[in-house]
Amino acid sequence: MSVSAPLLDAKVRYGRDGWLPLPHTLSDPDVRKLRQRIEGISREQRPEVVLEEGSSAVRALHGCHDFDEVCARLVRLPALVGLAEQLLGGPVYVYQFKVNMKQAHEGAAWPWHQDFAFWHHEDGMGAPDAVNIAIFLDDVTDENGPLEVIPGSQHAGIVEDTARPGRERSHDWRHHVSAKLEYVVPDEIAGRLAGTFGVRRLTGPAGTAVAFHPSIIHSSSNNTSAQRRCVLLITYNRVTNTPAHPVRPPFLVSRDSTPVVPVDADRL
């Protein structure tokens, strides 16, 4: 099958920069449908719902595609699956599904980190042959804690946390989803890389979609605004890159590496 020139350009840009704005955006009705489901799940008491430390504010939701029909259809939209397969060069499955919610005035920051550090050290993923696709469910602005990436930083490989040498690691999964992350990139290293490559804030209206590399260094600030910032993230992993013995809960790391079969149309 031939690859179109625009897709080749996209693959080159993704390989160079580690992130890519997607031409596919969710329609307003689909965004509203997802918001409704996410808000409903947020009110449930279940392990997939993570709260901010010392607060009743919801920080994140995990694995919603395993128990919610709307989220299950979302991960099978042809535009998303097709892009993931083209970027990764083969069949993919859903490795992670999460919704990061920064509540107005309460949403805490995510420090500089790389997703692949968690997946490699905790789950045994062999290579960063995966892709994150972020979908904005709210308008994301400079004020409500947007995702910030260091373009090209994925080429540095895994940047170990040298700021705390000898620190005993915790394998409690809660330390992988809180504001006090287990694997972080020290500010001085992130600052040095940012000085070389720059920093890009990923903002846009609700429905915007962005792809980014598992090894790209990224962070986000506190939400000090009066507007919530909700971003849904789907991680597609190449089937041949499936970790052999993941130990974290299934709602964090899928055990089902069956290739995703797209639905018939790009709508929910």
Swiss-Prot record:
EC number, as in UniProt: 1.14.11.57
Annotated catalysed reactions: L-proline + 2-oxoglutarate + O2 = trans-4-hydroxy-L-proline + succinate + CO2
SUPFAM superfamilies registered for this protein in UniProt: Clavaminate synthase-like
GO biological process: antibiotic biosynthetic process; antibiotic metabolic process
Note on cofactor: Binds 1 Fe(2+) ion.
Necessary cofactors: Fe(2+)
Alphabetical list of InterPro entries matching this protein: Phytyl_CoA_dOase-like
Associated pathway: Antibiotic biosynthesis
Variation of activity with pH: Optimum pH is 7.5.
Thermal effects: Optimum temperature is 25 degrees Celsius.
UniProt-annotated binding residues for Fe cation: 113, 115, 218
Enzyme class at the top of the EC tree: oxidoreductase
MF-aspect GO terms: 2-oxoglutarate-dependent dioxygenase activity; iron ion binding
Regulation: Competitively inhibited by pyridine-2,4-dicarboxylate. Inhibited by diethyl pyrocarbonate (DEPC), 3,4-dihydroxybenzoate, pyridine-2,5-dicarboxylate, alpha,alpha'-dipyridyl, and some metal ions such as Co(2+) and Zn(2+).
PANTHER family in UniProt: ECTOINE DIOXYGENASE (PTHR20883:SF48), PHYTANOYL-COA DIOXYGENASE DOMAIN CONTAINING 1 (PTHR20883)
Family, similarity comment: Belongs to the PhyH family.
Subunit structure: Monomer.
Functional description taken from the UniProt entry: Involved in the biosynthesis of the peptidolactone antibiotic etamycin (viridogrisein).
Protein name: L-proline trans-4-hydroxylase
Species of the source: Streptomyces griseoviridis
